[in-house]
């Protein structure tokens, strides 16, 4: 890891405008505080609604509302992130919307409030994700983005683990709605951390993955991205992965409630925390070794573990083995989370359409996640976990096969920032 840190410093100092320690730390801690606020309390929604007497089908519909909103928002959000210089302002808007959605969820498990809050939370996917990607790339450039992405995911995972524990404790020892008031409160330090990132250090051309001669504001067209066959194939693989993966943890939460575990919120927190601890340890390693050994070998590991995890969960409900499944989830999360940004950066180099491409991939993933949570909710309700998990394993295996057969190495021999 000392070697990785050395490579990161060397790459950073090679940039035209190296980012200050203040900006780097601000980005670190924004990732820490926003990670669980943006995605983690979404996992608690399934548990919260199940405790409130909602059926699996109703919960699936509620979760799908967030997925559909996220799907709609990501392409325009990515295009906006490419077009504007106000990257920090875009992130701030997303954080504020997330806080409002958390407060609405905490008020009452009323269908209209829950549905509206889920839509608001989903919309932030098209704002916060491209904003963080643009800020990161703008601060460090492509020559250091692998290690910066690993650092982003390390802080995000550590924040996810800690705040999931706090939110689980709030739900157990106060009341279930306290989970969401805790999530809303975490938006405040996220905004403070964002304020430490210096706007004058975010290089506009780098933030869009544009060349210096292509530094004008250009409207990215989705049609142009679909001419990039390798990007299309990678997007298809991530779509299949999300179709298999997105519903697994919410279903595990519902099953904990059905099994009538004492203090189920704490047990659910454990299942959320375990993969985040794994991601926190592995993400910098993934970033470093993706530079040393390339993206493809790590992608095959990340995608290949998902069908194994689904098969394991199909044949056991013992809590220790659920933890094993979540360790696998942490490995896949570290690999795919870090490498998705890197592969997109590789494949859009010089186009100025990096954030639009992130939005397109995110939209496809959002479609898959939305279909997964709604369809599997009814599937598990009708046939139970054993039958429900096996189709997910088959879909994950298909995603792995697509990477194996059609997605070659994307890492360039030399970077041009």
Residue ranges and their predicted role:
Residues 49-50, 80-81, 169-174, 256-257, ...:
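Interfacial helix-cap and linker-helix signal at transmembrane-aqueous boundaries
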Residues 171-185, 378-396:
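A membrane-interface helix-boundary motif in multi-pass transporters
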Residues 119-156, 343:
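Cytoplasmic helix-loop-helix junction between adjacent transmembrane helices
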Residues 14-67, 232-233, 237, 242-256:
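Helix-loop boundary and gating motifs at the non-cytosolic
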Residues 89-103, 297-312:
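Structural signature of the two symmetry-related core transmembrane helices
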Residues 73-86, 282-294, 380:
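Helix-to-loop junctions at the C-terminal end of transmembrane segments
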Residues 112-120, 320-329:
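Paired small-residue
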Residues 4-24, 201-234:
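Juxtamembrane intracellular "pre-TM" segments in multi-pass secondary transporters
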């Amino acid at each position: 890891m000392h070697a990785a840190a050395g490579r990161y410093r060397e790459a950073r100092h090679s940039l035209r405008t190296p980012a200050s320690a203040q900006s780097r730390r601000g980005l670190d801690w924004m990732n820490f505080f926003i990670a669980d606020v943006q995605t983690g309390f979404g996992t608690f929604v399934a548990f919260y609604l199940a405790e409130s007497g909602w059926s699996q089908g109703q919960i699936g519909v509620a979760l799908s509302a967030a997925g559909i909103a996220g799907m709609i928002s990501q392409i325009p959000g990515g295009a906006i992130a490419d077009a504007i210089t106000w990257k920090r302002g875009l992130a701030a808007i997303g954080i504020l919307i997330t806080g409002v959605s958390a407060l609405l969820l905490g008020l009452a498990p009323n269908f209209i409030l829950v549905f509206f809050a889920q839509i608001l939370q989903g919309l932030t996917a098209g704002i916060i994700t491209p904003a963080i990607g643009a800020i990161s790339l703008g601060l460090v450039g492509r020559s250091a983005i692998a290690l910066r992405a690993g650092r982003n995911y390390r802080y995000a995972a550590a924040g996810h683990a800690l705040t999931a524990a706090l939110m689980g404790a709030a739900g157990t020892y106060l009341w279930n709605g306290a989970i969401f008031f805790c999530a809303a409160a975490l938006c405040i330090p996220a905004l403070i951390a964002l304020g430490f990132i210096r706007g004058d250090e975010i290089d506009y051309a780098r933030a869009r993955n544009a060349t210096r001669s292509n530094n004008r504001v250009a409207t990215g067209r989705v049609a142009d991205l679909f001419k990039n066959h390798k990007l299309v194939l990678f997007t298809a693989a991530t779509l299949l992965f999300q179709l298999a993966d997105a519903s697994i943890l919410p279903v595990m939460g519902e099953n904990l409630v059905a099994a009538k575990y004492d203090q189920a919120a704490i047990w659910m927190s454990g299942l959320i925390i375990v993969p985040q601890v794994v991601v926190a340890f592995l993400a910098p390693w993934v970033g470093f070794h993706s530079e040393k050994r390339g993206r493809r070998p790590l992608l095959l590991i990340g995608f290949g573990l998902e069908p194994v995890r689904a098969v394991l969960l199909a044949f056991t409900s013992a809590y220790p083995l659920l933890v094993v499944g979540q360790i696998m989830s942490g490995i896949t999360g570290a690999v795919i989370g870090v490498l998705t940004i890197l592969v997109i950066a590789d494949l859009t180099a010089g186009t100025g359409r990096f954030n639009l491409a992130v939005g397109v991939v995110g939209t496809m993933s959002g479609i898959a996640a939305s279909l997964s949570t709604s369809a599997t909710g009814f599937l598990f309700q009708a046939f139970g976990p054993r039958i429900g998990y096996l189709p997910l394993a088959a879909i994950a295996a298909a995603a792995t096969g697509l990477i194996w057969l059609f997605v070659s190495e994307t890492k360039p021999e030399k970077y041009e920032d």
